[in-house]
Amino acid sequence: RRFLDRGGRWLAIHGAAAYIEFKGPEVEIGGITLPGLTDTPDRQPDYMDLLGCRFVSHLAPQEIAIESVSDHEIVRGLQPLAVVDEPYILEIRGDCEVLLSSRYTGEAPGYVEGPWLEDVPRPQALLHRRGLGETLYLAPGHCVGPYDLRPFIDELPAHPGPWANPAYRELLRRAIRWGTG
């Protein structure tokens, strides 16, 4: 909190906005047995307030079309992105400037919250100001290694997600430059 209040910049990516718990009996989703439905209770409100958002749920991984909705230096002139990722549903906290947005609707398999059927803009990158500082949060960023879901499944196919996309890597370069500038 003091870091941001004094002018610090914090770059947070993808799962940084998530706090999850499993609820209820075991459930099988896509061949993977989970210890229950995934719940995202608001148990870390101070942290989420610093971040500017809270992860609520996500749709099944799919291609997401993302476009700039701001003239901020981080996204100015950035080509539209089409990335394979988990389409995140976020709860915005506080005064945030949305930099990138997308639209999607659908089921949220394995989650307590959902389905998400309202066709509304979904933030993909946002800037949250606090004190003299700022937090930049990027929702895309899911990648899968072969052993990432142990102990739920022994091995699964690796997938780089948006990290394989040159436009996403350019966004990351800009975000890092912003964070260190």
Language-model features, listed with the residues they occupy:
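Short glycine-/acidic-enriched loop or helix-start segments at secondary-structure transitions
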Residues: I20-K23, G110, Y147-D148
